[in-house]
Structures are given as structure tokens and as C-alpha cells.
Regions:
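A structural motif
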Residues: 72-75, 137-141, 159-166
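An active-site-proximal beta-strand-loop segment
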Residues: 49-84, 94
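Active-site beta-loop-alpha junctions of metal-dependent nucleic acid enzymes
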Residues: 66-69, 85-113
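C-terminal domain-tail junction helix/linker
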Residues: 45, 142-144, 165-217
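Acidic/histidine-rich, metal-coordinating catalytic segments
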Residues: 91, 109-127, 150-152, 204-207
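Basic, flexible linker segments flanking DNA-binding modules
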Residues: 1-59, 120, 130-139, 209-215
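Short small-residue beta-strand/loop micro-motif enriched in glycine and branched aliphatics
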Residues: 82-86, 147-149, 173
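RNase H-like polynucleotidyl transferase catalytic core
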Residues: 115-118, 136-159, 176-178
């Protein structure tokens, strides 16, 4: 107590560095969202979709001068981590429908279910009991199940959220865009790289390798 000027946490840290095992004074409670989900067995069983607003610092030229914004739609197959991304100028349900059509053409497998948050680009669940969101109409017509995560629980869409953080780190921190065409041109190159990047969660394989192995069975 007397003659020691460091905090308890500092003392514990120093003891661990010297190889002295000390129990924590208080065990950390488990996080509420530390839970396991059912293992997926095939590509397309569940696809997470979300939208990322392109950072304002990445805009240049007319798109910035006119006060416009750009948005990245992202889909990630939970089984293989294989992704598809596309940029739009407006954050609307109609663009979600356009993205779905592009996604169906891009993914070489049948999409059985998609999982999204409760944003109005995906659902009118909390604003209208009578009017159906165009995105949900498109899903129903395509025979794709729509799963909605509980409100304010982004960790339920954790795979697409993490992929957006990687996009920020490896893409948006380095790129600038004058319009949506330039965004999509550069996104195509980034997508090719990210789908070929080895991942620890896939045992050192890339999403493309994981997908090809699954489709070859």
C-alpha cells in the first residue's frame, strides 16, 4: 500500500511480463453478443447485405462541389465470405432492388436467404403495416427469404460490418472519387483483391478458393 506509486492494473501487467501469474481482480463479464450461430453448410444459405456511405473525405470534383453523396451496397456470403459490392448515388429502396438484380447475376449460386438491418432501403417494417418495401417485393418474387436483425444489434450482421471496416482500411483511406462511375471502376479492382485475399477464418484460404471448393463437390 505504501511506497508503491503504480496502479493495480500496472502492477498486474508488470507481474505478467515477469512470468508471475496473477488472477484478475474482477473477471470480465461476457459480452452480450458473444454467441455462436448455426454452422452454414453451403454457399447462398445466408447472405448478409448492408450499405456503407462513402466517406466525405473520399469525394472530389463535381460530386463534392454539388453536395452529393455516394453509397456502397455490399453482400457477403456467410459460408464462403465471397462478396459483391456496387456503388450508387442515392440511398433508396429502388437502388436496393437494382443491387439485388446485379447480385443474383454476380453470385454463381442460388441465394436462399438475405439478412439485413431495418433501414428503409430494405424494409418498411417500422413505418408502415400496409405498404411493402420494393426490396422486399423483389425478394419475394425471387423466392428469397428476408431475415431482419433485431433493432440496434449490428453485430448480428457482423460479417458485412467487418468487411466494411476492411474496405475503409484498405480502400477508402487511399482512394478518391469524382463520380459514381469512378467509384465502381475502383470498387471492381478492390473486390477482385478482397475475394482473393487469404483469411484466417477460412483456414488461410481466400473466399474464392472456399467458394470453388464448395461448388466442385
Amino acid at each position: 500500500k505504501y511506497g508503491y506509486g503504480r496502479s493495480l492494473s500496472g502492477m498486474v501487467y508488470a507481474a505478467r511480463r515477469m512470468g508471475i501469474c496473477m488472477a484478475d481482480s474482477k473477471a470480465k463479464p461476457p459480452r452480450k453478443h458473444d454467441r455462436r450461430y448455426p454452422e452454414l453448410l453451403r454457399p447462398g444459405e445466408k447472405v448478409q447485405i448492408d450499405v456503407k456511405e462513402v466517406p466525405y473525405s473520399c469525394l472530389k470534383g463535381a460530386v463534392k462541389q454539388d453536395g452529393k453523396r455516394l453509397y456502397q451496397w455490399t453482400a457477403i456470403d456467410e459460408f464462403s465470405r465471397y462478396r459483391f459490392v456496387y456503388g450508387f448515388e442515392e440511398h433508396t429502396p429502388e437502388n436496393s432492388v437494382k443491387f439485388l438484380k446485379l447480385l443474383e447475376a454476380a453470385f454463381p449460386f442460388k441465394i436462399e436467404a438475405v439478412q439485413t438491418d431495418n433501414g428503409t432501403e430494405f424494409t418498411y417494417r417500422y413505418i408502415s403495416e400496409e405498404k411493402e418495401c420494393p426490396f422486399e417485393t423483389a425478394l419475394r418474387e425471387a423466392g428469397i427469404e428476408h431475415r431482419l436483425i433485431p433493432p440496434r444489434t449490428p453485430w448480428h450482421n457482423g460479417k458485412v460490418e467487418r468487411s466494411h471496416r476492411n474496405d475503409q482500411r484498405y480502400f477508402y483511406d487511399w482512394e478518391r472519387f469524382g463520380d459514381v462511375d469512378e467509384l465502381n471502376h475502383k470498387l471492381r479492382e478492390h473486390l477482385e483483391w478482397s475475394n482473393r485475399k487469404p483469411m484466417r477464418t477460412l483456414g488461410g484460404k481466400s473466399p474464392m478458393q472456399r467458394l470453388h471448393e464448395a461448388l466442385a463437390v
